[in-house]
Structure formats: structure tokens, C-alpha cells
Amino acid sequence: MKLKKRVSMFLVALTMCGGLFVTPAKAVKTTNYAEEIAALQPGTTPEEIMKSASQIAKQQHVKQDVILKQFYKEITADKAEGDRLAKESGMSIMGGSSGTKKLPTSAKGNIYYTNSYTAYYNHGHVGMYSAADKIVESVPSDGVRQIAYNARDVEDNSIVQTVSVSSSQKTAAADWAVSKVGDPYSFNFVNNRNTGHDGAKNCSKLLWSAFLLKAGIDIDSNGGLGVYPRDITSSSYTTTIMTIY
């Protein structure tokens, strides 16, 4: 009994000194992935992020936290790449910049990319030529819209790309995108590969769906849970044919 008492007193002493047990106050704080993701995606909420993660987790038979970590890994990697590109272009990584260049004309079905900020995050923006002198894109203010090519302001070092499919497939993809004019914008990038092709969509989802449905190709270069603008420009199917200075 005396031995047990001594051991108990020793353990208590270690606990009080922090030598054996880690108290809750000192425990490593678990990253709140949903809140951090929502902060990088203005227009979404942590609850929406959690709901999306839960749905995918059930489909893939994994824990919700596994999906949240994947969401977080993809969006923070994209942010790091966006900050790198912004620095190379001389843009402030604190955001608030606006483009000073105009898009050139290009062939129907070609795409363009420009750096673009939201909440201090250079997520980039992509759109598609619906005609030589028109583009179709999805933006927060209007959703999917079609405008004149020279109505779109872009940043220095923006690019125009061609997609490695037939002319008829590019035409079909562009026509499909135009048919979606009027659809609302979606701020959800982390899970946009898993949402429907109809309804709300962001810029990269619009192009990804168009080429998936009408050309049978996946222009998402890494095949993650979300397709981001730069996932498209780094695809093996896309080739830069012009850089705008």
C-alpha cells in the first residue's frame, strides 16, 4: 500500500510539473481546416465546407477529417503558387490590384488566364473565347456571362492558350459554355469537381465541365477534389500561344 501511495504521489507531482501529461491548455491545437478554407474562399462558410467534406467522405468511405485535410492541402498549395506568380509579376500579395491590359482576339475555344485576387489570395481567373471577339466566363458579380474580348481587363503576364482537341470539339465546348450564360457564380473551388455541371459554377468549373462534356478530356492537371484556374493552365492538354505584356 505504501508503495502504491508513493507511486501515486510521484505521478501527481509529475503531472503538476508537466513532466508526464500534457494538459488540455498545452495540447497542440488542431487546425480548424473548415474556417481557414472558408477564409480563403469568401462567399463560403465553414458549415458549407464541413457539409461538402462529409458528403465526399461518405462516398469514399473515409473520415471527414481526411477530406478536410485534402481540401486544405490543395487550396494552400494553390495559394502558395499564386503568391509566387504575383511576386514574379510585381503584384502586391496583399491584393486589391486590377488589370491594366486588354485581351487580344483569339480563336473560338481558346482559353485565357490572368492573375486575380480575392481576400489577399491570387487564385487566378480563366475564361474561354466564344468567338474571335467574344469571351465567356464566370465572375462573382454576374455569374456566367459573355462579353466582348476587349471588355476584360487582365494583368501583365496573362496568357492565351489553345487546347489540344479538334476544332469541332473546341467549338462544341465554347457553345456549351455560352449555353450556361445566366448561371450563378459559385465560390466553391475546393469541391467543384464533385458538383453538378448545371447550376452555379466558378470560372475553372465552367471550362472544366465544357471540355469534359464536349471533348471528353479532363483539363484538371492534378485531378484533386477541386479544379483551380492554374490546374487548367498547367494541364498537358493546354499550350500557351501568347503572353500579354
From Swiss-Prot:
Keywords: Signal. Residues 1-27 form the signal peptide. It comes from the Bacteria. InterPro entries: Papain-like_cys_pep_sf, Peptidase_C92. This is Uncharacterized protein YycO. It comes from Bacillus subtilis (strain 168). The gene is yycO.
